[in-house]
């Protein structure tokens, strides 16, 4: 028996067969070639991910406090929340009087966000769609991409998203983006985590999970793989994430090229400065105001 967090698995022949298949995996996958991205638009995956990936109200409160202090969250402010998920940020901003549109690729996430908005009596427009093809023009006072998947895109896609964000902002509008720094992914390189559970992104069943992390310093790309072995049948479900991280000057250059000028940069949501030890960047960028 293998215990983890109170979960016990019988060591059966199917489980051992599944582990053998995991042992034969490719040593180091090539990002965006051997691994793509998570199937966000798959209804089943969307439901499983939504159920297992949530953040605390404490995080949300801190983020909203920062947005208010920066003058970006005021009654009547038109805000686009990119990768809105189940509406954590969208609903919090709507409660503070903002006029919010949330966009996400996951059908279960959008459905859950709509239900939560109705239950709370809040008017929020939730759109199931791909941020890489969104088409708004000068429609928002602010755009947020918080706890999203900006780095889980190719550089080409990320450049296109920034262009579309800039187009969606009114002149003088603000963009808020948080991303993990390359050093965050570098620290994870080679890490492996084995754990036993009953509920993860492949569904609800007794399972043994291996999560692996990879980082490639020459390109600043990263990858994560999850092998989820069904303890009952030995079936192995594999999920992969590829990503492209950016040094801070590089990210600021991308924003500038898209038509947004970085105005403030922090090392976290506590408003601390970026240091050599920072594992994330929080960037506020402004679209140029209209010229007389």
Q: Predicted segment positions?
A:
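Conserved class I S-adenosyl-L-methionine
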Residues: 6-77
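Class I SAM-dependent methyltransferase "Motif I" SAM/SAH-binding loop
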Residues: 83-87
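Class I SAM-dependent methyltransferase SAM/SAH-binding core
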Residues: 88-133
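Conserved beta-strand signature within the Rossmann-like core of class I S-adenosyl-L-methionine
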Residues: 172-179
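SAM-dependent methyltransferase
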Residues: 179-252
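C-terminal lobe and adjacent flexible extensions of AdoMet/dcAdoMet transferase-like proteins
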Residues: 242-292
């Amino acid at each position: 028996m293998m215990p983890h967090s109170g979960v016990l698995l019988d060591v059966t022949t199917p489980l051992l067969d599944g582990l053998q298949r995991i042992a034969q995996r490719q040593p180091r996958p090539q990002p965006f070639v051997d691994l793509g991205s998570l199937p966000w638009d798959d209804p089943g995956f969307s439901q499983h991910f939504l159920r297992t990936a949530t953040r605390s109200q404490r995080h949300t409160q801190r983020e909203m406090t920062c947005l208010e202090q920066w003058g970006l969250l005021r009654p009547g402010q038109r805000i686009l929340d990119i990768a809105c998920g189940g509406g954590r940020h969208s609903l919090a901003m709507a409660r503070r009087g903002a006029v919010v549109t949330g966009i996400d690729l996951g059908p279960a996430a959008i459905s859950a966000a709509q239900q939560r908005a109705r239950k709370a009596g809040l008017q929020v427009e939730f759109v199931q769609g791909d941020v890489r093809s969104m088409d708004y023009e000068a429609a928002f006072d602010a755009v947020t991409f918080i706890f999203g998947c900006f780095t889980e895109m190719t550089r080409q896609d990320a450049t296109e998203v920034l262009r579309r964000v800039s187009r969606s902002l009114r002149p003088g509008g603000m963009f808020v983006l948080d991303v993990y720094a390359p050093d965050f992914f570098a620290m994870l390189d080679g890490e492996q985590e084995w754990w036993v559970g009953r509920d993860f992104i492949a569904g609800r069943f007794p399972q043994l999970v291996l999560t692996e992390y990879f980082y490639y310093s020459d390109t600043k790309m990263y990858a994560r793989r999850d092998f989820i072995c069904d303890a009952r049948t030995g079936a192995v479900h594999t999920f992969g994430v590829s990503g492209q991280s950016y040094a801070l000057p590089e990210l600021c250059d991308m924003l500038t090229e898209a038509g947004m000028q970085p105005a403030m940069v922090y090392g976290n949501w506590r408003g601390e400065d970026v240091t050599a030890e920072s594992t994330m960047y929080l960037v506020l960028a402004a679209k140029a105001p209209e010229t007389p």
